[in-house]
Amino acid sequence: MSFFKGYVKTRDKRCAEKFKARTDFKTLEQVQSLDEYAGILANDAVLIDVDDGDQAELLMDIVEHLQLNCRVYQTTRGKHFLFKNNSGQIQKCFTHTNLGCGLTADIKVGLKNSYSILKFDGKERFIEWDIEPGHEYDELPKWLVPVRGSTEFLTMDAGSGRNQSLFNYILTLQSADFTVEEARETIRIINRFILKDPLDESELDVILRDEAFQKRSHGSRSSTSLDCL
């Protein structure tokens, strides 16, 4: 799979030529000598743009720990993470949106005529992470899709209501069509990588027990408490 269906000349990170409703894009060989160019995202590609340096490193830690088959470009402020979007679970672009895992990012999809700057100011962006030859890129993990509402997991520490916040977050994830297992995986990722002071495994098991999901599917955010389990 190629993440790009072609390339275009850019100027100050803006396209210097038309690219919508077009199929005759330049090849990589035709743009490599330029000081600046971009790749037009393929229809089955999605780009997670994390401009905050600290948050980009957190997401990179998750990618490395899970050994995800994706591509990661270093940018001037953060990182770009590219995945497949074959299932079409992301249908539009987002700006400064909350991801399921508790981070904030911009999202670009090839379905909406999006592009990614690959060379700027005479320097090609470094590919920090990529698949091995013969491997396939992964579909975008569910914990990277946008969710409504925000919980400041990044700033939480001991005594700030982490347990109840994670428990409440189950409803947010279920409202975004996360399955039970997808929600469990997401909350475990938040606990391990996003919280400054993670809960121990026994506390997490209480939050993620089966009864929590049964109650949340029939209750409301205001009426259900972790203490009720």
Predicted stretch roles:
Residues 1-77, 84-87, 157-158, 178-184:
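Signature for HUH/AEP ssDNA processing cores
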Residues 12, 126, 149, 163, ...:
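Positively charged, low-complexity intrinsically disordered regions
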Residues 38-41, 147, 177-180, 194-197, ...:
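Short secondary-structure junctions and interdomain/linker hinges
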Residues 41-55, 60, 84-186:
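DNA replication initiation modules
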Residues 65, 174, 190-193:
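Conserved short hydrophobic interaction patches
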Residues 184-229:
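Basic, alpha-helical nucleic-acid-binding regions used in initiation and control of genome expression
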